[in-house]
From Swiss-Prot:
Reactions catalysed: cytidine(1402) in 16S rRNA + S-adenosyl-L-methionine = N(4)-methylcytidine(1402) in 16S rRNA + S-adenosyl-L-homocysteine + H(+)
Keyword annotations: Cytoplasm, Methyltransferase, rRNA processing, S-adenosyl-L-methionine, Transferase
Enzyme Commission identifier(s): 2.1.1.199
UniProt function note: Specifically methylates the N4 position of cytidine in position 1402 (C1402) of 16S rRNA.
SUPFAM superfamilies documented for this protein: Putative methyltransferase TM0872, insert domain (SSF81799), S-adenosyl-L-methionine-dependent methyltransferases (SSF53335)
Main location: cytoplasm
Name used for this protein in its record: Ribosomal RNA small subunit methyltransferase H
Domain of life: Bacteria
GO MF annotation: an example: rRNA (cytosine-N4-)-methyltransferase activity
Length: 317
């Protein structure tokens, strides 16, 4: 990890306040990370309270284990398995679910993890280093069309075709990408127009990381599970860091907080319709200037909050 950088939890107070913690409540932190949110939640729980923390990253699990708090249950899995793991733990409903999405600062700043183009390190990018395919392995076998699609769709990179073509051309010459430095250099050659303040490798690294870790697939899988698990009055709090994540969250919350659409002219009053499963709470929240001065990486963070309706829907989306 780079020296001198201190991990600062994004929207720490805001996220935990949004959960409206009950001392005897049951809460889920879907992304423990280095435990900033979880520690604050635990500080507000009483002896009967409970927190279940998920994380794929073995390093995060090690940090969580050090807390040694009987109210904390640690799950070394991705949050897409929320239903399965809560069933295993004998938990039905919960009072709040928190998701702090994306890659964490410690992961970015640890050169050995292969998330950053700032270091020359093995091209890994797995959040869970105990399983799955590395970025280097995938780039060594994927065809040009698949690489192009991933970089275009998950990185919104205009030069996705050029980058994919160059990767495959290098392979045909026996030159396989094995380090972050090699991939960053290739991107620099292919991205002809650079965005101000952005490295030419930024979008490609984001795209491959999202794909390797199935980040958007897992997000789409967990949102409806979270709604079903919330008891009436329970809160869902989601912090997103880029437009692809936030678009999924925004559309899901919009649909889950809207009444069902009915054919025009149907003789049904609004009062007769079932209550939507969610109610939006406040407006989207961003970090303030003071916090951004301490943690510039939080500039893209946006938090959305919703509350489970009093009338439960079996058909929560």
């Amino acid at each position: 990890m780079s020296a001198g950088f201190v991990h600062v939890t994004v929207l720490l107070q805001e996220a935990v306040e949004a959960l409206a913690i009950r001392p005897d409540g049951v809460y889920v932190d879907c992304t423990f990370g280095r435990g900033g949110h979880s520690r604050l939640v635990l500080s507000r729980l009483g002896p009967a309270g409970r927190l279940v923390a998920f994380d794929k990253d073995p390093q995060a699990i090690a940090v969580a284990t050090e807390l040694d708090d009987p109210r904390l249950t640690i799950v070394h899995e991705g949050f897409a398995g929320l239903d399965r793991e809560l069933d295993r733990l004998g938990i039905d409903k919960v009072d709040g679910v928190l998701m702090d999405l994306g890659v964490s600062s410690p992961q970015i700043d640890d050169a050995s993890r292969g998330f950053s183009f700032r270091f020359d390190a093995p091209l890994d990018m797995r959040m869970d280093t105990t399983r799955g395919e590395t970025a280097a392995d995938w780039l060594a076998r994927a065809d040009e069309a698949e690489i192009r699609t991933v970089i275009r769709d998950y990185g919104e990179e205009r030069f996705a075709a050029s980058i994919a073509r160059a990767i495959v051309a290098n392979r045909l010459e026996g030159q396989f990408l094995t380090t972050t430095g090699e991939l960053a250099a290739l991107c620099a050659r292919c991205v002809r127009t650079r965005e101000k303040g952005q490295d030419p490798a930024t979008r490609t690294f984001q795209a491959i990381r999202i794909f390797i870790n199935r980040e958007l697939d897992e997000l789409q899988a967990v949102l409806p599970q979270a709604v079903r698990r919330l008891r009436p009055g329970g809160r869902l709090v989601v912090i997103a860091f880029h437009s692809l994540e936030d678009r999924i969250v925004k559309l899901f919350l919009r649909d889950a907080s809207s009444p069902p659409e009915l054919p025009r002219g149907l003789p049904v009053r609004a009062a007769d319709l079932p209550e939507p499963p969610l109610r939006l709470v406040g407006k989207p929240v961003r970090e303030g200037d003071e916090q951004l001065a301490r943690n510039p990486r939080a500039r893209s963070a946006i938090m959305r909050v919703a509350e489970r309706s009093a009338v439960a829907w079996d058909a929560a989306p």
